[in-house]
Amino acid sequence: MSNDGSKILNYTPVSKIDEIVEISRNFFFEKQLKLSHENNPRKKDLEFRQLQLKKLYYAVKDHEEELIDAMYKDFHRNKIESVLNETTKLMNDILHLIEILPKLIKPRRVSDSSPPFMFGKTIVEKISRGSVLIIAPFNFPLLLAFAPLAAALAAGNTIVLKPSELTPHTAVVMENLLTTAGFPDGLIQVVQGAIDETTRLLDCGKFDLIFYTGSPRVGSIVAEKAAKSLTPCVLELGGKSPTFITENFKASNIKIALKRIFFGAFGNSGQICVSPDYLLVHKSIYPKVIKECESVLNEFYPSFDEQTDFTRMIHEPAYKKAVASINSTNGSKIVPSKISINSDTEDLCLVPPTIVYNIGWDDPLMKQENFAPVLPIIEYEDLDETINKIIEEHDTPLVQYIFSDSQTEINRILTRLRSGDCVVGDTVIHVGITDAPFGGIGTSGYGNYGGYYGFNTFSHERTIFKQPYWNDFTLFMRYPPNSAQKEKLVRFAMERKPWFDRNGNNKWGLRQYFSLSAAVILISTIYAHCSS
Protein backbone atom coordinates (compact mmCIF):
# COMPACT_ATOMS: atom_id res chain seq x y z
CA MET A 1 0.00 0.00 0.00
CA SER A 2 1.60 3.23 -1.12
CA ASN A 3 0.34 6.74 -0.58
CA ASP A 4 2.90 8.67 -2.58
CA GLY A 5 0.93 11.86 -3.04
CA SER A 6 3.22 13.14 -5.79
CA LYS A 7 2.03 10.32 -8.09
CA ILE A 8 -1.64 11.26 -7.71
CA LEU A 9 -1.63 14.94 -6.77
CA ASN A 10 -0.50 17.79 -8.92
CA TYR A 11 1.71 19.58 -6.41
CA THR A 12 1.42 23.34 -6.48
CA PRO A 13 4.63 24.88 -7.88
CA VAL A 14 6.52 26.50 -5.02
CA SER A 15 7.15 29.51 -7.25
CA LYS A 16 3.39 30.20 -7.40
CA ILE A 17 2.65 29.99 -3.70
CA ASP A 18 3.43 33.63 -2.92
CA GLU A 19 1.02 34.66 -5.67
CA ILE A 20 -1.71 32.42 -4.24
CA VAL A 21 -1.24 33.94 -0.79
CA GLU A 22 -1.40 37.44 -2.25
CA ILE A 23 -4.64 36.61 -4.09
CA SER A 24 -6.15 35.48 -0.79
CA ARG A 25 -5.08 38.66 0.99
CA ASN A 26 -6.25 40.94 -1.81
CA PHE A 27 -9.66 39.28 -2.00
CA PHE A 28 -10.18 39.88 1.70
CA PHE A 29 -9.38 43.60 1.45
CA GLU A 30 -11.51 43.99 -1.68
CA LYS A 31 -14.41 42.26 0.06
CA GLN A 32 -14.12 44.57 3.05
CA LEU A 33 -13.95 47.61 0.76
CA LYS A 34 -17.23 46.64 -0.90
CA LEU A 35 -18.85 46.03 2.47
CA SER A 36 -17.76 49.44 3.71
CA HIS A 37 -19.95 51.10 1.05
CA GLU A 38 -23.07 49.20 2.06
CA ASN A 39 -25.78 50.90 4.12
CA ASN A 40 -25.69 47.97 6.53
CA PRO A 41 -22.28 46.26 6.21
CA ARG A 42 -22.93 43.73 8.97
CA LYS A 43 -26.19 42.52 7.44
CA LYS A 44 -24.62 42.22 4.00
CA ASP A 45 -21.62 40.40 5.45
CA LEU A 46 -23.90 37.95 7.27
CA GLU A 47 -25.72 37.16 4.04
CA PHE A 48 -22.41 36.60 2.23
CA ARG A 49 -21.01 34.32 4.92
CA GLN A 50 -24.16 32.22 5.17
CA LEU A 51 -24.27 31.83 1.39
CA GLN A 52 -20.70 30.49 1.32
CA LEU A 53 -21.48 28.02 4.10
CA LYS A 54 -24.54 26.82 2.20
CA LYS A 55 -22.37 26.28 -0.88
CA LEU A 56 -19.90 24.31 1.20
CA TYR A 57 -22.66 22.16 2.67
CA TYR A 58 -24.04 21.14 -0.72
CA ALA A 59 -20.55 20.64 -2.13
CA VAL A 60 -19.89 18.05 0.59
CA LYS A 61 -23.39 16.57 0.34
CA ASP A 62 -23.22 16.17 -3.43
CA HIS A 63 -19.74 14.62 -3.32
CA GLU A 64 -20.21 12.49 -0.19
CA GLU A 65 -19.93 9.12 -1.93
CA GLU A 66 -16.92 10.30 -3.90
CA LEU A 67 -15.24 11.47 -0.70
CA ILE A 68 -15.97 8.19 1.10
CA ASP A 69 -14.58 6.23 -1.84
CA ALA A 70 -11.46 8.40 -1.88
CA MET A 71 -10.83 7.78 1.82
CA TYR A 72 -11.23 4.05 1.22
CA LYS A 73 -8.61 4.23 -1.52
CA ASP A 74 -6.27 6.20 0.71
CA PHE A 75 -6.31 3.89 3.74
CA HIS A 76 -9.09 1.33 3.44
CA ARG A 77 -11.45 3.12 5.82
CA ASN A 78 -14.86 1.44 5.88
CA LYS A 79 -17.93 3.42 4.88
CA ILE A 80 -19.67 3.43 8.28
CA GLU A 81 -16.58 4.87 9.94
CA SER A 82 -16.29 7.62 7.32
CA VAL A 83 -19.99 8.48 7.50
CA LEU A 84 -19.98 8.54 11.30
CA ASN A 85 -16.71 10.37 11.88
CA GLU A 86 -16.35 12.56 8.81
CA THR A 87 -19.20 13.40 6.45
CA THR A 88 -22.18 13.42 8.84
CA LYS A 89 -20.26 15.25 11.55
CA LEU A 90 -18.99 17.83 9.04
CA MET A 91 -22.37 18.53 7.47
CA ASN A 92 -23.97 18.89 10.90
CA ASP A 93 -21.24 21.35 11.89
CA ILE A 94 -21.85 23.46 8.78
CA LEU A 95 -25.62 23.53 9.31
CA HIS A 96 -25.11 24.52 12.94
CA LEU A 97 -22.85 27.42 11.96
CA ILE A 98 -25.40 28.67 9.43
CA GLU A 99 -28.10 28.50 12.09
CA ILE A 100 -26.24 30.31 14.89
CA LEU A 101 -24.29 32.79 12.75
CA PRO A 102 -26.80 35.68 13.13
CA LYS A 103 -26.35 35.47 16.89
CA LEU A 104 -22.56 35.08 16.68
CA ILE A 105 -22.05 38.08 14.44
CA LYS A 106 -24.16 40.38 16.62
CA PRO A 107 -22.08 42.82 18.75
CA ARG A 108 -22.20 42.43 22.53
CA ARG A 109 -23.02 45.38 24.78
CA VAL A 110 -20.66 46.01 27.72
CA SER A 111 -21.51 48.28 30.65
CA ASP A 112 -19.22 50.18 33.02
CA SER A 113 -20.80 52.42 35.63
CA SER A 114 -17.69 54.43 36.53
CA PRO A 115 -17.94 58.16 35.66
CA PRO A 116 -15.75 58.23 32.51
CA PHE A 117 -17.82 55.49 30.86
CA MET A 118 -21.27 55.65 32.41
CA PHE A 119 -22.73 57.89 29.69
CA GLY A 120 -20.85 56.28 26.82
CA LYS A 121 -21.66 53.16 24.83
CA THR A 122 -19.33 50.16 24.73
CA ILE A 123 -19.76 47.25 22.38
CA VAL A 124 -17.54 44.29 21.54
CA GLU A 125 -17.74 43.13 17.95
CA LYS A 126 -16.09 40.12 16.36
CA ILE A 127 -14.28 41.01 13.18
CA SER A 128 -12.63 38.78 10.60
CA ARG A 129 -8.93 38.12 11.08
CA GLY A 130 -8.16 38.31 7.36
CA SER A 131 -6.41 35.59 5.37
CA VAL A 132 -5.88 32.33 7.26
CA LEU A 133 -3.85 29.20 6.57
CA ILE A 134 -5.27 25.77 7.44
CA ILE A 135 -2.88 22.80 7.41
CA ALA A 136 -4.82 19.53 7.63
CA PRO A 137 -3.65 16.04 8.71
CA PHE A 138 -4.20 12.64 7.10
CA ASN A 139 -6.11 10.76 9.79
CA PHE A 140 -9.43 12.54 9.20
CA PRO A 141 -8.56 14.26 5.95
CA LEU A 142 -12.00 15.70 5.25
CA LEU A 143 -13.29 16.69 8.69
CA LEU A 144 -10.05 18.17 9.99
CA ALA A 145 -9.68 20.25 6.82
CA PHE A 146 -13.25 21.40 6.25
CA ALA A 147 -14.44 21.86 9.86
CA PRO A 148 -11.91 24.65 10.52
CA LEU A 149 -12.50 25.90 6.97
CA ALA A 150 -16.22 26.24 7.73
CA ALA A 151 -15.44 28.12 10.95
CA ALA A 152 -13.08 30.41 9.05
CA LEU A 153 -15.78 31.11 6.44
CA ALA A 154 -18.34 31.79 9.18
CA ALA A 155 -15.94 34.35 10.65
CA GLY A 156 -15.57 36.10 7.29
CA ASN A 157 -12.00 35.15 6.43
CA THR A 158 -10.34 34.10 3.20
CA ILE A 159 -8.61 30.74 3.34
CA VAL A 160 -5.58 28.97 1.97
CA LEU A 161 -6.02 25.24 2.58
CA LYS A 162 -3.16 22.75 2.58
CA PRO A 163 -4.62 19.19 2.57
CA SER A 164 -2.50 16.22 3.58
CA GLU A 165 -0.43 14.72 0.79
CA LEU A 166 -0.69 11.35 2.57
CA THR A 167 -4.35 11.06 1.54
CA PRO A 168 -3.98 12.12 -2.09
CA HIS A 169 -7.26 10.72 -3.43
CA THR A 170 -9.20 12.65 -0.80
CA ALA A 171 -7.14 15.79 -1.41
CA VAL A 172 -7.97 15.69 -5.13
CA VAL A 173 -11.71 15.35 -4.48
CA MET A 174 -11.64 18.16 -1.90
CA GLU A 175 -9.89 20.51 -4.30
CA ASN A 176 -12.28 19.65 -7.13
CA LEU A 177 -15.40 20.23 -5.05
CA LEU A 178 -14.07 23.54 -3.73
CA THR A 179 -13.26 24.61 -7.28
CA THR A 180 -16.74 23.77 -8.60
CA ALA A 181 -18.84 24.86 -5.60
CA GLY A 182 -19.29 28.40 -6.89
CA PHE A 183 -17.14 30.26 -4.38
CA PRO A 184 -15.86 33.67 -5.51
CA ASP A 185 -12.36 33.48 -6.97
CA GLY A 186 -9.84 34.12 -4.22
CA LEU A 187 -12.07 33.21 -1.28
CA ILE A 188 -10.65 29.69 -0.89
CA GLN A 189 -7.29 28.71 -2.34
CA VAL A 190 -5.86 25.18 -2.24
CA VAL A 191 -2.16 24.38 -2.14
CA GLN A 192 -1.25 20.75 -2.78
CA GLY A 193 2.13 19.42 -1.76
CA ALA A 194 4.38 18.17 1.00
CA ILE A 195 7.26 19.63 3.02
CA ASP A 196 8.58 22.14 0.46
CA GLU A 197 5.16 23.60 -0.27
CA THR A 198 4.19 23.79 3.39
CA THR A 199 7.50 25.40 4.30
CA ARG A 200 6.98 28.10 1.68
CA LEU A 201 3.49 28.81 3.03
CA LEU A 202 4.85 29.16 6.56
CA ASP A 203 7.82 31.27 5.50
CA CYS A 204 5.81 33.86 3.57
CA GLY A 205 4.70 35.57 6.80
CA LYS A 206 1.53 36.94 5.21
CA PHE A 207 -1.22 35.14 7.11
CA ASP A 208 -3.38 36.53 9.90
CA LEU A 209 -3.82 33.12 11.56
CA ILE A 210 -2.35 29.66 11.08
CA PHE A 211 -4.42 26.63 12.05
CA TYR A 212 -2.40 23.41 12.21
CA THR A 213 -3.49 19.88 13.11
CA GLY A 214 -0.83 17.21 13.45
CA SER A 215 2.08 16.01 15.53
CA PRO A 216 3.71 17.95 18.40
CA ARG A 217 7.07 17.79 16.57
CA VAL A 218 5.77 19.57 13.47
CA GLY A 219 3.55 21.78 15.61
CA SER A 220 6.61 23.26 17.30
CA ILE A 221 8.07 24.05 13.86
CA VAL A 222 4.84 25.75 12.81
CA ALA A 223 4.77 27.82 16.00
CA GLU A 224 8.41 28.84 15.58
CA LYS A 225 7.89 29.99 12.00
CA ALA A 226 4.65 31.79 12.89
CA ALA A 227 6.41 33.65 15.70
CA LYS A 228 8.86 35.22 13.25
CA SER A 229 6.02 37.23 11.69
CA LEU A 230 4.01 37.53 14.93
CA THR A 231 1.30 35.40 13.36
CA PRO A 232 -1.09 33.82 15.89
CA CYS A 233 -1.58 30.11 15.48
CA VAL A 234 -3.80 27.34 16.75
CA LEU A 235 -2.15 23.96 17.30
CA GLU A 236 -4.30 20.84 17.50
CA LEU A 237 -1.79 18.17 18.48
CA GLY A 238 -1.91 14.87 20.37
CA GLY A 239 -0.12 12.90 23.06
CA LYS A 240 -0.61 9.87 25.26
CA SER A 241 -4.20 10.06 26.47
CA PRO A 242 -4.78 7.87 29.56
CA THR A 243 -7.86 5.81 30.37
CA PHE A 244 -8.73 4.87 33.95
CA ILE A 245 -10.79 1.94 35.20
CA THR A 246 -10.77 2.71 38.90
CA GLU A 247 -11.22 0.68 42.06
CA ASN A 248 -14.83 1.77 42.45
CA PHE A 249 -16.08 0.71 39.04
CA LYS A 250 -18.89 -1.84 38.89
CA ALA A 251 -17.64 -5.19 37.62
CA SER A 252 -20.96 -5.69 35.84
CA ASN A 253 -20.09 -2.81 33.49
CA ILE A 254 -16.61 -4.01 32.50
CA LYS A 255 -17.75 -5.36 29.14
CA ILE A 256 -19.52 -2.13 28.22
CA ALA A 257 -16.47 -0.13 29.27
CA LEU A 258 -14.13 -2.28 27.16
CA LYS A 259 -16.38 -1.95 24.12
CA ARG A 260 -16.24 1.82 24.43
CA ILE A 261 -12.49 1.81 25.04
CA PHE A 262 -11.78 -0.51 22.09
CA PHE A 263 -14.01 1.65 19.87
CA GLY A 264 -11.69 4.56 20.55
CA ALA A 265 -8.42 2.64 20.67
CA PHE A 266 -8.85 0.62 17.46
CA GLY A 267 -11.10 2.88 15.40
CA ASN A 268 -9.30 4.32 12.37
CA SER A 269 -6.56 1.81 13.24
CA GLY A 270 -5.69 3.87 16.31
CA GLN A 271 -4.75 6.84 14.15
CA ILE A 272 -6.82 9.32 16.15
CA CYS A 273 -5.34 12.13 18.20
CA VAL A 274 -7.86 11.38 20.97
CA SER A 275 -7.46 7.59 20.98
CA PRO A 276 -7.13 5.97 24.41
CA ASP A 277 -3.37 5.48 24.28
CA TYR A 278 -3.06 3.30 27.38
CA LEU A 279 -5.34 1.79 30.00
CA LEU A 280 -4.80 2.02 33.76
CA VAL A 281 -6.72 -0.61 35.73
CA HIS A 282 -6.92 -0.91 39.51
CA LYS A 283 -5.50 -4.19 40.80
CA SER A 284 -8.82 -5.24 42.38
CA ILE A 285 -10.52 -5.37 38.99
CA TYR A 286 -7.49 -6.04 36.77
CA PRO A 287 -7.93 -9.86 36.41
CA LYS A 288 -11.58 -9.45 35.38
CA VAL A 289 -10.67 -6.77 32.83
CA ILE A 290 -7.94 -8.89 31.23
CA LYS A 291 -10.24 -11.91 31.09
CA GLU A 292 -12.96 -9.88 29.38
CA CYS A 293 -10.58 -8.29 26.84
CA GLU A 294 -10.29 -11.42 24.69
CA SER A 295 -14.06 -11.92 24.68
CA VAL A 296 -14.82 -8.36 23.57
CA LEU A 297 -12.03 -8.33 20.98
CA ASN A 298 -13.35 -11.52 19.37
CA GLU A 299 -16.87 -10.12 19.47
CA PHE A 300 -15.65 -7.08 17.54
CA TYR A 301 -13.54 -9.14 15.14
CA PRO A 302 -14.88 -12.73 14.88
CA SER A 303 -12.44 -13.19 12.01
CA PHE A 304 -9.59 -10.98 10.92
CA ASP A 305 -8.00 -11.11 7.48
CA GLU A 306 -7.14 -8.87 4.56
CA GLN A 307 -10.86 -8.53 3.72
CA THR A 308 -11.79 -7.24 7.17
CA ASP A 309 -13.20 -3.72 7.29
CA PHE A 310 -10.30 -2.38 9.29
CA THR A 311 -8.50 0.85 8.50
CA ARG A 312 -4.91 0.45 7.35
CA MET A 313 -1.89 2.31 8.61
CA ILE A 314 -1.45 5.36 6.42
CA HIS A 315 1.80 4.19 4.78
CA GLU A 316 4.62 1.68 5.12
CA PRO A 317 6.75 3.77 7.53
CA ALA A 318 3.78 4.02 9.92
CA TYR A 319 3.15 0.29 9.53
CA LYS A 320 6.77 -0.61 10.25
CA LYS A 321 6.85 1.69 13.26
CA ALA A 322 3.70 0.11 14.70
CA VAL A 323 4.97 -3.43 14.16
CA ALA A 324 8.36 -2.57 15.67
CA SER A 325 6.67 -1.09 18.75
CA ILE A 326 4.50 -4.16 19.25
CA ASN A 327 7.47 -6.48 18.77
CA SER A 328 9.57 -4.51 21.25
CA THR A 329 7.19 -4.87 24.19
CA ASN A 330 7.90 -7.26 27.03
CA GLY A 331 4.22 -7.77 27.76
CA SER A 332 1.69 -10.48 26.97
CA LYS A 333 -0.51 -9.92 23.93
CA ILE A 334 -4.14 -10.45 23.04
CA VAL A 335 -5.21 -10.33 19.38
CA PRO A 336 -8.33 -11.63 17.59
CA SER A 337 -8.19 -15.41 17.86
CA LYS A 338 -9.06 -16.05 14.21
CA ILE A 339 -6.39 -14.16 12.27
CA SER A 340 -5.78 -15.28 8.72
CA ILE A 341 -3.68 -12.88 6.68
CA ASN A 342 -2.34 -14.56 3.58
CA SER A 343 -1.13 -11.49 1.73
CA ASP A 344 1.98 -9.49 2.49
CA THR A 345 0.88 -7.46 5.51
CA GLU A 346 3.59 -4.89 4.87
CA ASP A 347 2.10 -4.19 1.47
CA LEU A 348 -1.37 -4.04 3.04
CA CYS A 349 -0.21 -1.89 5.97
CA LEU A 350 -2.59 -3.97 8.08
CA VAL A 351 -1.89 -4.17 11.81
CA PRO A 352 -4.34 -6.30 13.85
CA PRO A 353 -5.81 -4.73 17.00
CA THR A 354 -3.44 -5.69 19.79
CA ILE A 355 -3.85 -5.55 23.57
CA VAL A 356 -0.66 -5.71 25.64
CA TYR A 357 -0.73 -6.44 29.39
CA ASN A 358 1.68 -7.46 32.16
CA ILE A 359 3.78 -4.37 31.52
CA GLY A 360 5.07 -1.41 33.52
CA TRP A 361 5.77 2.25 32.88
CA ASP A 362 9.19 1.40 31.46
CA ASP A 363 7.77 -0.63 28.57
CA PRO A 364 8.63 0.68 25.06
CA LEU A 365 4.91 1.17 24.35
CA MET A 366 4.78 3.75 27.15
CA LYS A 367 7.47 6.07 25.75
CA GLN A 368 5.50 8.02 23.15
CA GLU A 369 2.09 8.26 21.52
CA ASN A 370 1.42 4.93 19.78
CA PHE A 371 -0.94 6.19 17.04
CA ALA A 372 -1.62 2.58 16.07
CA PRO A 373 -4.15 -0.16 16.97
CA VAL A 374 -2.33 -1.17 20.14
CA LEU A 375 -3.56 -0.73 23.71
CA PRO A 376 -1.12 -1.21 26.61
CA ILE A 377 -2.74 -2.05 29.97
CA ILE A 378 -1.01 -1.22 33.26
CA GLU A 379 -2.16 -2.49 36.65
CA TYR A 380 -2.09 0.14 39.40
CA GLU A 381 -2.64 0.12 43.15
CA ASP A 382 -2.58 3.73 44.38
CA LEU A 383 -4.47 6.37 42.41
CA ASP A 384 -2.41 9.34 43.62
CA GLU A 385 0.87 7.61 42.78
CA THR A 386 -0.49 6.76 39.34
CA ILE A 387 -1.47 10.36 38.70
CA ASN A 388 2.00 11.42 39.85
CA LYS A 389 3.49 9.09 37.25
CA ILE A 390 1.32 10.51 34.48
CA ILE A 391 2.30 14.06 35.42
CA GLU A 392 5.94 13.02 35.46
CA GLU A 393 5.89 11.08 32.18
CA HIS A 394 3.02 12.34 30.02
CA ASP A 395 1.53 15.52 31.44
CA THR A 396 -1.18 17.56 29.64
CA PRO A 397 -2.71 14.89 27.38
CA LEU A 398 -5.24 15.92 24.77
CA VAL A 399 -7.94 14.00 26.63
CA GLN A 400 -8.37 11.68 29.59
CA TYR A 401 -11.00 8.97 29.96
CA ILE A 402 -12.41 7.85 33.30
CA PHE A 403 -14.50 4.79 34.08
CA SER A 404 -15.50 5.08 37.72
CA ASP A 405 -18.64 5.03 39.83
CA SER A 406 -17.04 7.18 42.51
CA GLN A 407 -17.36 10.94 42.15
CA THR A 408 -14.55 11.27 44.69
CA GLU A 409 -12.18 9.34 42.42
CA ILE A 410 -13.34 11.29 39.38
CA ASN A 411 -12.75 14.59 41.19
CA ARG A 412 -9.27 13.51 42.29
CA ILE A 413 -8.27 12.75 38.72
CA LEU A 414 -9.87 15.86 37.22
CA THR A 415 -8.42 18.17 39.86
CA ARG A 416 -4.85 16.94 39.54
CA LEU A 417 -4.45 15.92 35.91
CA ARG A 418 -4.62 18.68 33.32
CA SER A 419 -5.97 17.72 29.91
CA GLY A 420 -7.53 19.31 26.87
CA ASP A 421 -10.78 17.45 27.45
CA CYS A 422 -12.19 14.67 29.63
CA VAL A 423 -14.83 12.01 29.08
CA VAL A 424 -16.38 10.00 31.90
CA GLY A 425 -17.92 6.68 30.90
CA ASP A 426 -17.01 6.71 27.20
CA THR A 427 -14.20 7.52 24.76
CA VAL A 428 -13.66 9.67 21.67
CA ILE A 429 -17.36 10.48 21.24
CA HIS A 430 -17.00 13.96 22.77
CA VAL A 431 -15.51 15.32 19.53
CA GLY A 432 -18.96 15.02 18.01
CA ILE A 433 -20.53 17.58 20.36
CA THR A 434 -21.41 20.44 18.05
CA ASP A 435 -21.02 23.47 20.28
CA ALA A 436 -18.31 22.45 22.75
CA PRO A 437 -14.65 23.53 22.54
CA PHE A 438 -12.16 20.95 21.33
CA GLY A 439 -8.47 21.61 21.87
CA GLY A 440 -5.36 20.79 23.83
CA ILE A 441 -3.32 22.17 26.69
CA GLY A 442 0.44 22.27 27.09
CA THR A 443 2.16 19.83 24.76
CA SER A 444 -1.17 18.67 23.29
CA GLY A 445 -1.68 22.07 21.70
CA TYR A 446 -3.40 25.39 22.27
CA GLY A 447 -6.50 27.07 20.96
CA ASN A 448 -9.79 25.33 20.25
CA TYR A 449 -12.68 25.12 17.85
CA GLY A 450 -16.15 23.66 17.45
CA GLY A 451 -19.31 25.65 16.69
CA TYR A 452 -19.29 28.91 18.66
CA TYR A 453 -15.66 28.34 19.69
CA GLY A 454 -14.48 27.85 16.13
CA PHE A 455 -16.10 31.13 15.15
CA ASN A 456 -14.30 32.83 18.04
CA THR A 457 -10.96 31.29 17.08
CA PHE A 458 -11.14 32.72 13.57
CA SER A 459 -12.41 36.11 14.78
CA HIS A 460 -10.86 39.05 16.61
CA GLU A 461 -12.82 40.70 19.39
CA ARG A 462 -12.68 44.46 18.95
CA THR A 463 -13.90 46.94 21.55
CA ILE A 464 -15.72 50.03 20.25
CA PHE A 465 -16.40 52.83 22.73
CA LYS A 466 -18.54 55.83 21.76
CA GLN A 467 -18.33 58.88 24.02
CA PRO A 468 -20.89 61.71 23.82
CA TYR A 469 -19.84 65.36 24.02
CA TRP A 470 -22.39 66.66 26.51
CA ASN A 471 -21.00 64.74 29.51
CA ASP A 472 -17.73 66.60 29.96
CA PHE A 473 -18.78 67.52 33.49
CA THR A 474 -17.85 63.94 34.50
CA LEU A 475 -14.46 64.13 32.79
CA PHE A 476 -13.12 67.64 33.48
CA MET A 477 -10.83 66.51 36.31
CA ARG A 478 -8.52 64.80 33.80
CA TYR A 479 -7.69 68.12 32.12
CA PRO A 480 -4.89 70.49 33.19
CA PRO A 481 -4.22 72.37 35.32
CA ASN A 482 -3.88 69.68 37.99
CA SER A 483 -4.69 70.27 41.64
CA ALA A 484 -4.93 68.44 44.94
CA GLN A 485 -8.67 68.96 44.84
CA LYS A 486 -8.90 67.17 41.48
CA GLU A 487 -6.76 64.31 42.77
CA LYS A 488 -9.11 63.80 45.72
CA LEU A 489 -12.04 63.94 43.36
CA VAL A 490 -10.52 61.36 41.03
CA ARG A 491 -9.85 59.01 43.91
CA PHE A 492 -13.29 59.45 45.38
CA ALA A 493 -15.07 58.99 42.07
CA MET A 494 -12.91 56.33 40.44
CA GLU A 495 -11.20 54.22 43.07
CA ARG A 496 -13.17 51.16 44.08
CA LYS A 497 -13.11 50.10 47.70
CA PRO A 498 -12.57 46.46 48.69
CA TRP A 499 -15.42 44.56 50.29
CA PHE A 500 -12.98 42.39 52.29
CA ASP A 501 -10.42 43.06 55.01
CA ARG A 502 -6.70 42.23 54.99
CA ASN A 503 -7.45 38.72 56.19
CA GLY A 504 -9.73 38.09 53.23
CA ASN A 505 -12.94 38.27 55.27
CA ASN A 506 -15.87 39.99 53.60
CA LYS A 507 -17.09 43.17 55.27
CA TRP A 508 -20.41 44.93 55.00
CA GLY A 509 -21.10 48.57 54.34
CA LEU A 510 -23.39 50.91 52.48
CA ARG A 511 -20.53 52.88 50.98
CA GLN A 512 -20.15 50.61 47.96
CA TYR A 513 -23.83 51.11 47.17
CA PHE A 514 -23.91 54.89 47.39
CA SER A 515 -20.37 56.01 46.58
CA LEU A 516 -20.99 56.20 42.85
CA SER A 517 -24.12 58.34 43.08
CA ALA A 518 -22.44 60.58 45.65
CA ALA A 519 -19.43 60.92 43.36
CA VAL A 520 -21.57 62.06 40.45
CA ILE A 521 -23.33 64.65 42.63
CA LEU A 522 -20.02 65.90 44.01
CA ILE A 523 -18.45 66.14 40.56
CA SER A 524 -21.43 68.10 39.27
CA THR A 525 -21.30 70.50 42.23
CA ILE A 526 -17.57 71.16 41.93
CA TYR A 527 -17.82 71.57 38.17
CA ALA A 528 -20.61 74.11 38.58
CA HIS A 529 -18.57 75.95 41.23
CA CYS A 530 -15.42 76.01 39.06
CA SER A 531 -17.33 77.24 36.05
CA SER A 532 -18.97 80.15 37.89
UniProtKB/Swiss-Prot annotation:
Spans through the membrane: 134-152
Gene name, Swiss-Prot/TrEMBL: HFD1
Lineage: Eukaryota, Fungi, Dikarya, Ascomycota, Saccharomycotina
GO cellular-component term (any): endoplasmic reticulum
Subcellular location: Lipid droplet; Mitochondrion outer membrane; Endosome membrane; Cytoplasmic granule membrane
The entry's keywords: Endosome, Lipid droplet, Membrane, Mitochondrion, Mitochondrion outer membrane, NAD, Oxidoreductase, Phosphoprotein, Transmembrane, Transmembrane helix
GO biological-process terms attached to the record: aldehyde catabolic process; aldehyde metabolic process; sphingolipid metabolic process; ubiquinone biosynthetic process
InterPro entries membership: Ald_DH/histidinol_DH, Ald_DH_C, Ald_DH_CS_GLU, Ald_DH_N, Aldehyde_DH_dom, Aldehyde_DH_NAD(P)
Protein name: Fatty aldehyde dehydrogenase HFD1
Enzyme Commission number(s) of this protein: 1.2.1.3, 1.2.1.64
Gene Ontology MF, one: aldehyde dehydrogenase (NAD+) activity
Pfam families: Aldedh
